[in-house]
Amino acid sequence: MIGFRNGRTLMMNLGGAAALLPDAPVRPLGAPGEAEVGAALLGRVVDGAGNPIDGLGPIRGAGHWPLAGRIQSPLDRGRVLAPMDVGVRAINGLLTVGQGQRVGIMAGSGVGKSVLLGMMVRAARADVVVIGLIGERSREVADFLETKVAGEARARAVVVAVPANHSPVLRIRGALRATAIAEAFRAEGKKVLLIIDSLTRVAHAGREIGLALGEPASACGYPPSAIAMLPNLIERAGSDVHTGGSITAIYTVLADGDDGNDPVVDSARSILDGHIVLSRAMAERAVYPAIDISKSVSRVMNDIVPRDHQQAARALRQHLATYEENRDLVLMGAYRAGSDAAIDAAIAYHPAIMEFVRQDTDQIVPLEDAAAELTGVFGDAPDGTHG
């Protein structure tokens, strides 16, 4: 059911074409709006309707949770006070993520988004990882499962896969289902990492439904309802003060045409507690993960890392910003050493900074090691000064 008009209920198929007639009777089957949840789903892959698609048979012993979540008071949400180790040096060191934080990965196509997600799935120190693959190509879903969610990572993961050829209703339900599964684990006191790839595809599904209902299109063709549903989805993540559990959520956001002002990008940036921007220029220079440090931010980092870590991260950002501002002068040979101490320091530290950001896909760098390596970038000058 997607809406009402002139005393009639408007409905949309969950699957393909069906032999329906006008005024045909409609009978509900099963409990409406509930998701199967719990430990029975660990290691399993389900579709947007909750049906297992991994060939491992039916899921037995699962509990139930409302797809739309349970209403919580804002006072039931805890503050973000502890870091979440994701195993990626640049994120742990410069964009530290907290338990219960909501983070967006903003990226165009082909800049290493899926690879970065795979690194975090394997390395994150979480009790459970819930992954919603929404609106992706079927081939990419299979590839992600076989290469990014394998071995030990698969045993603690639940995957909800709804490819692009499924109905928009199922794509939205897939995101709701993944979030409901994460909420149920949080209610058990678990530390959950929730990954939705991608939030943009969820908005696209909302756009299809909204336009089918006759809603007026606004920016980039999105009707108001498509953007308005994003806060409801994102706000369900966070910490629970009663159980001690948390949902640390990572949402990928596709910057169509590398447009940072896309309505979905703008909306997500205003709601989320931080964003990680992947740069095509960095990817073209073979720097992976291609994180644009100067355009990325974690809004809770200063609350969860010690002061010396904060100072080293701030110094690295300053040197990187100075280098990027004067990059053309340096590359053309127009800058003369000794003209400006800040530029001299930025040039001296730049190779070490780029080496800090680079990381092999199969390498795991714990939070403690990332903090130590960050300070080591500056040698004997932990504040980033260059003598």
Enumerate the language-model features and the residues they cover:
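P-loop NTPase catalytic core
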Residues: 93-94, 100-387
